[in-house]
Amino acid sequence: GSVILKDIFDKCYLGDLKLNSHIIRTGTWETETEDGGFLTPEVFDRYEKIAKSGTGAIISEIFALDHRDRFYPYSTNMNYKGFFKDYKEITDLVHKYNVPILGQLAFFYYNDGLNQKVEPNDISLEGIRRLQAEVIMAAKKLSFAGFDGMQINMGNNFYLARFINPYFNQREESYGGNTEKRVRIGSENIKLIKDNFALNISCRVNPNDVRK
């Protein structure tokens, strides 16, 4: 039978993740790092406050891979030396309150090794494979750091949002055309991640980007 929501603090499930409430804290910009990218005490304190506030699940701030990406200064670099130590401490902290946490990966631009801001129509198949390999590597890092899942940002007019949008994507091969082909860049990654990691996978998408 159907489940009736009586209270926003009722327990529920997000996929196979058990949540203490229906409240999901979405990803934000933290921008509070010390030299070398290490997290400040304020970030740890904030995560603990969120976890013990009744939140059902937490989606992290944006994680970035390329230091030249547009929002890199406001993001956490997944390649800094303290990533595993800092974020294992974060995930252990929120797990004390039985709150699952997903790491959010985003590309505003994409650097395919030839063009720092390659457009969806211009990226080669090799470039697409490179992007997908980077997403898989990010999933591996998140898994090692104790995250329960991963959110791939395919919204906010970021790179993957533009790639799946026919306004920007006029490709005529297997990654362009109908909706299934345009989202293939993401759906292939989701399958690979689910086949290889015990991570809950979600995607952030725009219901409408105000373009015709």
What are these regions (language model features)?
Residues 1-212:
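Flavin-dependent oxidoreductase catalytic cores
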